[in-house]
Amino acid sequence: MLFLVISTPAPPRPSEVREHRKNFWPWMQDKLDRGIARSVYPRTGRGAVVTFDVDSHETLHRLLNQWADAVPAEFAIYPLMEPESIIAFLNEDSAAA
């Protein structure tokens, strides 16, 4: 299950959460190394954009709680499809629908 997650950190000053933010990157690197995250990009200013590839909603929920524990944030979550999935869907016989 693919999800695009965009974080918007809580309002404290960046200097107040600097150490927590430093801890985020090793945590995220572990997710990249294990294939749980496919990509991560820091947003200009603060926040990050991550593509997670997880086996369940519960796994995503657990990851977001760990993330928010390290860097308190709000998350926008967008479910995604693999490109080949949408191509297969579009090529299905429309009469079958």
Predicted regions, residues:
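Conserved, structured core segments of small domains
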Residues: 1-97
